[in-house]
Amino acid sequence: MAKIIKVIGREIMDSRGNPTVEAEVHLEGGFVGMAAAPSGASTGSREALELRDGDKARYLGKGVLKAVDNVNGPIREALLGKDATAQAELDGIMIALDGTENKDKLGANAILAVSLAAAKAAAAAKGIPLYAHIAELNGTPGQYSMPVPMMNILNGGEHADNNVDIQEFMVQPVSAKSFREALRMGAEIFHNLKKVLKAKGLNTAVGDEGGFAPNLASNADALAVIKEAVEAAGYKLGTDVTLALDCAASEFYKDGQYDLSGEGKVFSSNGFSDFLKSLTEQYPIVSIEDGLDESDWEGWAYQTQILGDKVQLVGDDLFVTNTKILSRGIEQGIANSILIKFNQIGSLTETLAAIRMAKEAGYTAVISHRSGETEDATIADLAVGTAAGQIKTGSLCRSDRVAKYNQLLRIEEQLGEKAPYRGLTEINAKG
């Protein structure tokens, strides 16, 4: 038994200069796990609650001392003496202790930090890497793959202070034979994009996730400069590299319409889906995330009908890593992929359940960071340990993003051929 003897919570800083929760779980034998909760900017209304203090005199109300107190108080008391390898039991205890639908009593940030720290401590006690422990918890021991990175090299929306409405423009290095090669391809495209933007007299400052954030005349212009960068790097768009979008459409959904204020266009629900379809006909866009508002289920049905057989349609705000909402989507044939964010649901056990449900239904699962991150690289181990096949963890700068890429490099070095990089096959795995 990997007995828990100490649980510690503390307030640390995230990549946007806001506080977040870090937890340590100590076991008999000197084993320790430490993890931090991330934080989102564009958030779904049905996400588990991130508990903030609300004291405007301290961190502008964004302090997390209440959540930290919950770690050091009731959560600690409930978990002392428990077996850290019994992840489902630990998470169940914390969920029951909270007793609310969205974890608003203890805070999803408090529960998640402890949940992940316990998993890390358990892996240490078992003498195995975290990804191997996650694979065992997932019921898929020894089944690994290296994820295709969806690299957010141009930022807009809530992630940048510019006029681009679509939140993320991503490249996927699909012709690579390994993750290491994919990362190199992405880095070369990133550096070439900087040159392309500079040559056009455009801003090369970066957004929350490390992508460039220039002002552009239209969303199509963003795709055009990325195409130029891909070709300048010596790669062929559509063969070596494919494109992905995160529209985060809930952020510009107003009064039943989709308002692209950056380019002065307003669309109906079906009209915006038709607009996205036209972009996929001009560029090799193989994945679109949150192409409509989280509440626009009728519109999602239309978008799935016109794009679902050709494009990976990812539900982020739509599904919020929640099996209840995902099961409704599966039943109605809405989208064909789910974005997986630990802190949307608030525990490792519930996260694994969402990944399993998606895969069993023929949906793909894309593991994701948040725009507010720390140096914690747990999502890298999650992606490999569940063989999810795809990961979103930002651009090729900002150490909070690169930490995840570097952890994936280490894991690939350890696993070698046991963790294949499958490229476009992963994206085409949708049902």
Curated annotation (Swiss-Prot):
CDD domains to which the protein is assigned, alphabetical: enolase
Pfam families cross-referenced by the UniProt entry: Enolase_C (PF00113), Enolase_N (PF03952)
Pathway it works in: Carbohydrate degradation; glycolysis; pyruvate from D-glyceraldehyde 3-phosphate: step 4/5
Keywords: Cytoplasm, Glycolysis, Lyase, Magnesium, Metal-binding, Secreted
Main location: cytoplasm
Entry GO terms, CC: cell surface; extracellular region; phosphopyruvate hydratase complex
Binding positions ((2R)-2-phosphoglycerate): Q167, K341, R370, S371, K392
Catalytic activity: (2R)-2-phosphoglycerate = phosphoenolpyruvate + H2O
SUPFAM superfamilies recorded: Enolase C-terminal domain-like, Enolase N-terminal domain-like
GO terms under biological process: glycolytic process
EC number(s) stated in the UniProt entry for this protein: 4.2.1.11
Annotated Mg(2+) binding sites: D246, E289, D316
GO terms for MF: magnesium ion binding; phosphopyruvate hydratase activity
Cofactor(s) of this protein: Mg(2+)
CC cofactor note: Binds a second Mg(2+) ion via substrate during catalysis.
Class in the EC hierarchy, top level: lyase
Alphabetized PROSITE patterns for the sequence: ENOLASE
Active-site positions on this chain: E209 (proton donor), K341 (proton acceptor)
InterPro entries found in the cross-reference section: Enolase, Enolase-like_C_sf, Enolase-like_N, Enolase_C, Enolase_CS, Enolase_N
Function: Catalyzes the reversible conversion of 2-phosphoglycerate (2-PG) into phosphoenolpyruvate (PEP). It is essential for the degradation of carbohydrates via glycolysis.
Family the entry assigns: Belongs to the enolase family.
Complex formation: Component of the RNA degradosome, a multiprotein complex involved in RNA processing and mRNA degradation.
Protein name: Enolase
Upper lineage: Bacteria, Pseudomonadati, Pseudomonadota, Gammaproteobacteria, Alteromonadales
Name of the gene: eno
